Amino acid sequence: MARTKQTARKSTGGKAPRKQLATKAARKQAPSQVSGGVKKPHRYRPGTVALREIRRYQKSTELLIRKLPFQRLVREIAQDFKTDLRFQSSAIGALQEASEAYLVSLFEDTNLAAIHAKRVTIQPKDLQLARRLRGERS
């Protein structure tokens, strides 16, 4: 018979929790009464916010890198080739569109490399593999 993966399931029934001894109950309730019943802030489970952000950014079409920092980066890189270069705003916009499209595509390939290695976390070696498979780096 073939093996199948077991998945964890939440229990719907089972034993009721045991009653605590009076001293344990008093010890557990004492700190909460001293602090004045301050409620802890709500926290989502790990991964929930990440999945929400993934869905949000996959729906959106706006640029993710801020315009001015990207413009400064382009001008800084261009200084190495020629001083006093001028750029049309549409040229910097086109560079930014192309750069973001390239980065998104590269991270998609990097994620596939991590998944292939049976991981969910991308690592530098995944990025190196993705670039090598594309022929960008030997």
From Swiss-Prot:
The modification N6,N6,N6-trimethyllysine is found at K5, K28, K39, K82. Its main location: nucleus. One of its GO terms (molecular function) is protein heterodimerization activity. The modification N6-methyllysine is found at K5, K10, K15, K19, K24, K28, K39, K82. Keywords: Acetylation, Chromosome, DNA-binding, Methylation, Nucleosome core, Nucleus, Phosphoprotein. It is found in: Nucleus; Chromosome. Residues 1-49 are annotated as: Disordered. It comes from the Eukaryota. Phosphorylated to form H3S10ph. H3S10ph promotes subsequent H3K14ac formation and is required for transcriptional activation through TBP recruitment to the promoters. The modification N6-acetyllysine is found at K10, K15, K19, K24, K28, K39, K59, K67. The modification Phosphoserine is found at S11. The keyword Acetylation applies. It holds the Pfam family Histone. The modification N6,N6-dimethyllysine is found at K5, K15, K28, K39, K82. GO terms for cellular component: nucleosome; nucleus. Belongs to the histone H3 family. The nucleosome is a histone octamer containing two molecules each of H2A, H2B, H3 and H4 assembled in one H3-H4 heterotetramer and two H2A-H2B heterodimers. The octamer wraps approximately 147 bp of DNA. Core component of nucleosome. Nucleosomes wrap and compact DNA into chromatin, limiting DNA accessibility to the cellular machineries which require DNA as a template. Histones thereby play a central role in transcription regulation, DNA repair, DNA replication and chromosomal stability. DNA accessibility is regulated via a complex set of post-translational modifications of histones, also called histone code, and nucleosome remodeling. This is Histone H3. It comes from Cryptococcus neoformans var. neoformans serotype D (strain JEC21 / ATCC MYA-565).
